[in-house]
Amino acid sequence: MEKMTIRDVDLKGKRVIMRVDFNVPVKDGVVQDDTRIRAALPTIKYALEQGAKVIFLSHLGRPKGEPSPEFSLAPVAKRLSELLGKEVKFVPAVVGDEVKKAVEELKEGEVLLLENTRFHPGETKNDPELAKFWASLADIHVNDAFGTAHRAHASNVGIAQFIPSVAGFLMEKEIKFLSKVTYNPEKPYVVVLGGAKVSDKIGVITNLMEKADRILIGGAMMFTFLKALGKEVGSSRVEEDKIDLAKELLEKAKEKGVEIVLPVDAVIAQKIEPGVEKKVVRIDDGIPEGWMGLDIGPETVELFKQKLSDAKTVVWNGPMGVFEIDDFAEGTKQVALAIAALTEKGAITVVGGGDSAAAVNKFGLEDKFSHVSTGGGASLEFLEGKELPGIASIADKKK
């Protein structure tokens, strides 16, 4: 179902309350990485060009439903005003008369940021009173926060019961690309999964098995699968309670004719730190006790490249190793480059949020994919085929 977007509504002179994702790292009152703020700029600029008055709602971090200075959005207001080249008014409150007054004084083309939505206990409880208050401030709700789409909170879902909710450009792009790879992928379709835990990816493996031709598995989760196949994995990270499940998933894939490709070698070390002694071992020879696999090895990189070479659709979620440390980053980097090269050849390539997005940024490849998702948990749940409350609450386009 197509969702209504900010293009479908008249914004001239209207008050727009926009749920954005300004959940950025802040240190000593300074924004450390403004990627998420920049991602919201096209929607914000469009609303301002159309003559709207814009009020922003966002959370930052996980405060416990009460004000907490280290989670204040004040540094975000400062960074946003630098990026927009205009003053961003800031109210250090979420509800109350101070908020009402600031909204009443807003003029066309002006913007106002309210304090962290999670400073109020009603936000994560989806409290209708809080949602109603925020709705009373505006004519239209614009949801541009895909990162919280899997959560039913007052600022993205509750508010939509009181005023119309439409998608911003970022939300629209997320829905478009994730829908394509989840429901309507062009074949051959290859899924690349990594990261630490099998348990995080069970739903994705199960759902995408119905559609994918191949699933390539790297990252620490590979060791749970390798152990399920009777391989010696030394002191590598294994989810012991998920070994039987890994066996089941491998069996299921066989039944469905989906090829699951596991690593044939690994880069191992005795500690997870820079500059330690490291070796490459073949998986069939086993990883010795006291050593742990921290990246896929060079043979696996070649194998994965070969298995990706004819792909028309690729979804990548989770790094191949401990990419934060350069000694163990090569596998992730090479896989990222291989997928980026497919984008050049016309394939649809989607990178799930979270660590994969961080890896892509680290290697300076963020522009080399069809889409890099801004939501970690939200993109996983979308790929699992679940309906996300933060998308369901956006108005459908009229046929």
Swiss-Prot record:
Pathway: Carbohydrate degradation; glycolysis; pyruvate from D-glyceraldehyde 3-phosphate: step 2/5. The keyword Cytoplasm applies. GO terms for cellular component: cytosol. GO terms for biological process: gluconeogenesis; glycolytic process. GO terms for molecular function: ADP binding; ATP binding; phosphoglycerate kinase activity. It is found in: Cytoplasm. Gene3D superfamilies: Phosphoglycerate kinase, N-terminal domain. Its main location: cytoplasm. ATP binds at residues 201, 293, 324, 353-356. It catalyses: (2R)-3-phosphoglycerate + ATP = (2R)-3-phospho-glyceroyl phosphate + ADP. SUPFAM superfamilies: Phosphoglycerate kinase. Its EC number is 2.7.2.3. It comes from the Bacteria. Substrate binds at residues 21-23, 36, 59-62, 118, 151. CDD domains: Phosphoglycerate_kinase. Keywords: ATP-binding, Cytoplasm, Glycolysis, Kinase, Nucleotide-binding, Transferase. Belongs to the phosphoglycerate kinase family. Monomer. PANTHER family: PHOSPHOGLYCERATE KINASE, PHOSPHOGLYCERATE KINASE 1, CHLOROPLASTIC-RELATED. This is Phosphoglycerate kinase. It comes from Thermotoga sp. (strain RQ2). The gene is pgk.
